[in-house]
């Protein structure tokens, strides 16, 4: 009885120590150059090198390089680069263009930007200037027809011009052009006298607009310098 017990115990120990088939360096997947009943297993059957489940190189589940779940490069769940689920965290979106706050402030203080005129603004209504043209006929003509001439001018921000003359020249041209086109479409025409008088009137209004815009521009610049000085910044930080 004792001998039978010892023999049975020995058989159980040998069964536990016996290696399982299919492990490293077994007949199921040997290193290249080692013969095996299954033939050369390099690369292993049913997948490429390092393919546990039939995927490509380094593909645990059939995805691409470094793809745990079938997404693209660096895609944990099938989204784009840097996309956790393809719906957010898209850091590579182009950033929105920044708005020039200086020009916005200038436009708000001066007038509305006119659509379709390439950034020109329309100034506030003015009283038509009192002008003497050097002869009684033109003086009288102006007094009788001044309502036909513009009382607002078109202009660009003053910081886009190197001097007053350039500002005024551009202001006069665009204002007369727009006023002439608008008035002509209503069936009203201008004579040579009208054009001559209108040029003088609009020029004076553009000079007034330039002086107004220049003053506002330098005031805004002074305010920005004041608030950007270190003592003011320090004071604001304690408020």
UniProtKB/Swiss-Prot annotation:
Cu(2+) 3 binds at residues 69-71. GO terms for molecular function: copper ion binding. Residues 1-15 form the signal peptide. Residues 44-83 are annotated as: 5 X 8 AA tandem repeats of P-H-G-G-G-W-G-Q. Cu(2+) 4 binds at residues 77-79. Residues 16-222 are annotated as: Interaction with GRB2, ERI3 and SYN1. The keyword Transcription does not apply. It is a lipid-anchor; GPI-anchor. Residues 15-98 are annotated as: Disordered. The keyword Membrane applies. Its main location: membrane. Sequence repeats lie at residues 44-51, 52-59, 60-67, 68-75, 76-83. Residues 223-239 form a propeptide. Belongs to the prion family. Its primary physiological function is unclear. May play a role in neuronal development and synaptic plasticity. May be required for neuronal myelin sheath maintenance. May promote myelin homeostasis through acting as an agonist for ADGRG6 receptor. May play a role in iron uptake and iron homeostasis. Soluble oligomers are toxic to cultured neuroblastoma cells and induce apoptosis (in vitro). Association with GPC1 (via its heparan sulfate chains) targets PRNP to lipid rafts. Also provides Cu(2+) or Zn(2+) for the ascorbate-mediated GPC1 deaminase degradation of its heparan sulfate side chains. This is Major prion protein. It comes from Aotus trivirgatus. The lineage of its organism: Eukaryota, Metazoa, Chordata, Craniata, Vertebrata. The gene is PRNP.
